[in-house]
Amino acid sequence: MNTCAFLLILAVQIHADSVEGPTAGCTFDEDSDPSLCEFSQGEEDDFDWQLFRAHASPHSTSDLLRGSYMMVNSSQHAAGQRAQLLLQTLSENDTHCVQFSYFLYSRDGHSPGALRVYVRVNGGPLGIPVWNVSGSRGRQWHQVELAVSTFWPNEYQILLEATVDRKGYIAVDDILLLNYPCYKAPHFSRLGDVEVNAGQNATFQCVAAGRPSEAEKFLLERHNGEVSSGGSVKHLGRNRFAVSFQLEDVQKPEQDLYRCVTQSSRGSGVSNFAELIVKVPPSPIAPPQLLRAGSTYLIIQLNTNSILGDGPIIRREIEYRASLAPWSEILGVNMVTYKLWHLDPDTEYHISVLLTRPGEGGTGPPGPPLISRTKCAEPMRALRGLRASEIQSRQLTLQWEVPAFNLTRCHTYSVSLCYRYTTAGGGGGHNTTVRECLAVEHNTSRFTLRDLPPFHTIQIRLALANTEGKKEGKEVMFQTEEDIPGGIAPESLTFTPLEDMIFLKWEEPVEPNGLITQYEISYQSIESSDPGINVPGPRRTVSKLKNETYHMFSNLHPGTTYLISVRARTAKGFGQTALTEITTNISAPTFDYGDMPSPLSETENTITVLLRPAQGRGAPVSTYQVVVEEEAGRKVKRELGIQDCFPIPTSHGEAQARGAPHYYTAELPPSSLSEATPFTVGDNHTYNGYWNSPLDPRKNYLVYFQAMSNFRGETRINCIRIARKAACKDHQRALEVTQRSEEMGLILGVCAGGLVVLILLLGAIIIIIKKGRDYYSYSYYPRKPGNMNKTPITYRQEKSNMMGSMERSFTDQSTLQEDERMALSFMDTHTCSTRSDPRSSMNESSSLLGGSPRRQCGRKGSPYHTGQLHPAVRVADLLQHINQMKTAEGYGFKQEYESFFDGWDINKKKDKTKGRHDTLMGYDRHRVKLHPLLGDPNSDYINANYIDGYHRSNHFIATQGPKQETVYDFWRMVWQENCFSIVMITKLVEVGRVKCCKYWPDESEMYGDIKITLLKTETLAEYTVRTFALERRGYSAKHEVCQFHFTSWPEHGVPYHATGLLAFIRRVKTSTPLDAGPVVVHCSVGAGRTGCYIVLDVMLDMAECEGVVDIYNCVKTLCSRRINMIQTEEQYIFIHDAILEACLCGETAIPVNEFALAYKEMLRVDSQSNSSQLREEFQTLNSVTPHLDVEECSIALLPRNREKNRSMDVLPPDRALAFLVTTEGESNNYINAALMDSFHRPAAFIVTPHPLPGTTSDFWRLVFDYGCTSVVMLNQLNQSNSAWPCVQYWPEPGLQQYGPMQVEFLSMSADEDIITRLFRVKNVTRLQEGQLVVCQFQFLRWSAYRDVPDSKKAFLNLLASVQKWQRECGEGRTVVHCLNGGGRSGTYCASNILMEMIQYQNIVDVFYAVKTLRNAKPNMVETLEQYRFCYELVLEYLDCLEVR
């Protein structure tokens, strides 16, 4: 056969007879149809296959078989050369088999080469040989089957390749395509694509029909020719098995086409190519975005629009961790935003987003992290453990607990050590309080305070602050040790020098530095004008007792200067010395006369005496005088001694002219009397200008010798009578008669004058007593005995009051407006006096309203009644008066209020830019005038007016709330008027409008030249107290000012009840010092609320001191000072109701240190009334508790809400309702729950009945919506006295959904008193709101049929446990429930309020605590037993504190 080309694979032929056999093939015979057999030689090989026909070949040998076939003679080619034979491309639809025969033969038995079969699919690479054979197989044909499982539309092509090795022959023949399965080679079922995520294992499972031989090889071939072996075989049946190939940890580059291949000597099975699809798990390209950060949360946006990797995304998760933490947490997210809860404050977090696609391992790597930090949170509490490790006289070394992060809750924090001490003012001045705050180094718990005063009580407080808040600890007192005292102030040394004595007085050292034990005084003479004194003299020392701050020096020398030193001593030693020089006075000269000397001689006109020289004392004698005195009418006091001397020089002629009884008869120099010398009196000579006239023989004479010393302007005289000359008898008798006449006239004149004075004095006393009785004896209303201390009014006080009234009566009434005249009359009537007036004190225990014990009531002035249309009202008649005014048809509150506006006008409107309202400008006469600023004469204006208080003129300043441009003026006024208290009765913003600008700093700020520093803030439920320190440039003094900010006045109208406002007024009164300046009161415009406050303050004092109230005339008076002080009729009525409440309730607060005795007295049963004070107080509470009308509970009474109420008798008022926020289908927002205030926080409690089966979902909505972190359960489940059963409303254990709320049980602990359960609550409809951790406290010690708990200690344990949890979780609200949400819940809330009262204000006020709760819901604390339990619980609590 010479045919060059044959059809190897024939077209498919369909036989009509359906006889099984080859559908196509190549037998290479001569008679075969060449059009049906087609093959081609390879182009990438070394030589071609040859068609061999044995009968026609010239090279035929005995080694070759007979017949026609394709052959390779390896002896003609070099080893390694290849020849390829390509068969026709096939595309089959059904199972088929390719069969061919081959032989390999070499005469020497060696391998002629190898025969390999390849199956190429869709023109792709050859891949590996699916079948191959080598070696000499004998001189015979062998049959092979190929089971190729590649079907249309795919196509495949078979390639036969012969590789030469040694001499021999390789031949193929009878290549047939059979339309039935192969018998020897297994057929693979269709191999499906495999999709995996990168990094996962991929498994190809090749299912085949047939029976594999033991020598069968199973391969997984990659499209590029790589081969994997080691497949596991599993027999599925008799003629069916599966081979599994696992590719481990596949990655994206391994994505390719793969097929299964079986190999044996009998043939090969080849599957179709299946694709291994490797998907890369997705990962975000960008980090998440931070939307908002808080102290314990971060709100982020996932930001997953752009990703790396493959989708689809079926799950999104957040992975977060603290930057330095080894842990991380992953949370599932189903929204584009998410709120991370319960984070640590001031902590940096790494937050990444994880995306997941379908399949195992579909979660991609975390995306780029968002690195964000939470904000700081307010410190958990103040630092504790403050103690002194070392105490010295001038320094303290202090230690305290280390400020750990769980306390600071911020890495950036500051520890301030604030201390204060009081030093006594020098010179009798006021005490000065030194305050200073020092910053402590970071991360230290030790500090040394230096430069402290010795032996002083130092009060120290630690303050822990960060950017979000500040926590101050309690003050701890330390006392420094003693030191040597400071010096006695030289200016405090006062002395009185005498001739031989000095009286010295001094003050205690300004800095005693301890307890003074003694004073030491030293003195020494250092100079003297007496030449006979030796100076300096010896130094002498005297010790004085600690309480002796004076000394009398005696036995000193006259005219001598002494150096005196004084110093104090403490246990530490002597202090500095105070020095002074004091000179004693010179003394009069002394004479050396024994008895009166006898005259040397005597004539009718002369007498001769012996003059002896005098001795100077402290100064020498400067001159001598001889003095003659007529004896007529003069009695001799003593025969010899010092007489009244004669310092005024008088000559004889001058004495005659003036009628003087004595004259100088001679003046002698000291030099003339160096020794005793005779001298004749009356010798008619002149001595130094003085005529020694002869003596009159008719008169008696006394002769005196006088010596005089002069030194530095100081003169001392001494004289002595040295002689007496008698007159003639006749002249003496005449003189005596004249003298007696003169004496009798003098006596009669004195008696007459004394009688006149006595008559006038008695008349004045009678008039004053009569007027005093008329003025004070009249009392229009009876007084309750014992209400006031009756202080007697002295004559001086009466006279002062009378004169004041007289002076006012002469005031020019024409200059006053009608309202002002009325106001003056009102103030006169109620004895309004100035601050400096003397006032009587009030006995606190007997006061009518329990006001401040420091209130001075003065006299009991009569009410304003005489001829008046609006008289004062007795307190006892006030309730009846108010009821009449509210129900009156002709004349009531409306008409009375409108009468205030008759004839009002404003004549002066100035400085409108500084006024908040044009029509509310203050009257200029009572306007506060500021000290003008330099260069600005108009800067004296501020919209503020003085208002009189009760018994205190200008006690208040009513002003508008400061605007931005008037803040400096406001603080100028506070400084100028020395104000201590500022009362603010407005919020900064109300109804969307700015009512008052924030005129105070958060820390410290300058307003002009005034520096305001916030010292501390105390926040209560209804008001806030801020304490400021004021300093002004150019002034050394510091002022302390307290702002009392009432925050509970509603934006519209007046408060529903006056309880909180009355407590607020009492707090301001007790906190304001008596010597402070006016109380500044402001709201927004300085009227309305301001007027209400002032009227209440004045009327409370009047009611207490006089037993009456004069509201109408008080309001009229206020309006004369500042216009429109009461703006609405509603405010006017509120004042009456508030005064009534104050009078009915009184003051019920008890200091902690007096509580035990007070409560014992309250329990004492009065023998007459057979009732105790405690019972009467509870009855009063019931009488003032408001009763709810149907209109006040309109929402609870709606038909759709009736089924949500456990009892229709216990409904919450509309004003206190806690409306639900979370929606649930068609359910409304009502739940039977009321908001209640605690002592420190408004709406801190939510009181509700035990949930009904149909309101459990509402209960959990309430807990979540209001951020309630605690639930207090005071009843037990399934109580038999309940109208409906008390069901369990929580899951235990596990997780349960109540409407939109999912509640997950976390843990439980229990003891004999309390079961504590922890839950996690979240809203599944709004997962972005995060989750809430709630702790439930189920109290077990309250029996079903008892009004009070079984154990007070157990109840205190409950209160402490809840309080501790609330501190740890950030002060969320507390839900309190019992069976009906009344008595038990009220007892718990009242007890909580009382504990806070004791902790922060050291007072107990059970009445106030319960009344505050009842103002919101009347059934709080229902029984007397529960009310008494509150008292006894306080007693138990105080006992526990003492034990600690």
From Swiss-Prot:
CDD domains in UniProt:
FN3, MAM, R-PTPc-U-1, R-PTPc-U-2
What EC number(s) would the UniProt record show? Answer: 3.1.3.48
Kindly give the membrane topology term recorded for this protein.
Single-pass type I membrane protein
The signal peptide, as residue positions, is 1-16
What keyword terms does UniProt attach to this protein?
Cell adhesion, Cell junction, Cell membrane, Developmental protein, Differentiation, Disulfide bond, Glycoprotein, Hydrolase, Immunoglobulin domain, Membrane, Protein phosphatase, Receptor, Repeat, Signal, Transmembrane, Transmembrane helix
Topology check: give the Cytoplasmic ranges: 770-1444
GO molecular function terms noted in the UniProt entry? protein tyrosine phosphatase activity
GO-annotated biological processes: cell adhesion; neuron projection development; signal transduction; somite specification
According to the record, the segments passing through the membrane are 749-769
Q: Where does substrate bind?
A: E1051, C1083, S1084, V1085, G1086, A1087, G1088, R1089, Q1127
The cysteines joined by S-S bonds are: C206-C260
This protein is called: Receptor-type tyrosine-protein phosphatase U
Q: What is the lineage of its organism?
A: Eukaryota, Metazoa, Chordata, Craniata, Vertebrata
